[in-house]
Amino acid sequence: MLKLRLKRTGRKRSPSYRLVVMENTARRDGRPIEELGYYSPITKQYKFDVEKIKKWLDFGVKPTETVSSLLRKAEIIS
């Protein structure tokens, strides 16, 4: 089952994340099917490709709880 997930990048104690489409059984830092944006919790910056996210959501891909809250803050989903 495919999911919209966060993939951790960055250094130790300085996390940043990429929003990706991955198989739900894949490792957290495994190879994604597609990258859709990034999120930096320290600087509170994010950038998402809205068209690609909506395309994947239309295909039936489920976001995780954290990704859902980020997409609501970005007003991509309601």
From Swiss-Prot:
Q: Which UniProt keywords apply?
A: Chloroplast, Plastid, Ribonucleoprotein, Ribosomal protein
Task: Write one Gene Ontology MF term.
Answer: structural constituent of ribosome
Q: Which PROSITE patterns match?
A: RIBOSOMAL_S16
Compartments it resides in: Plastid, Chloroplast
Q: Name one GO cellular component term.
A: mitochondrion
Q: Which Pfam families match?
A: Ribosomal_S16 (PF00886)
Q: What are the BP-aspect GO terms?
A: mitochondrial translation
Q: Which InterPro entries match?
A: Ribosomal_bS16 (IPR000307), Ribosomal_bS16_CS (IPR020592), Ribosomal_bS16_dom_sf (IPR023803)
Matches recorded under PANTHER family: 30S RIBOSOMAL PROTEIN S16, SMALL RIBOSOMAL SUBUNIT PROTEIN BS16M
Q: Which NCBIfam families match?
A: S16
| UniProt similarity note | Belongs to the bacterial ribosomal protein bS16 family.
**Name of the featured protein:** Small ribosomal subunit protein bS16c
Q: Which organism was this protein described from?
A: Phaeodactylum tricornutum (strain CCAP 1055/1)
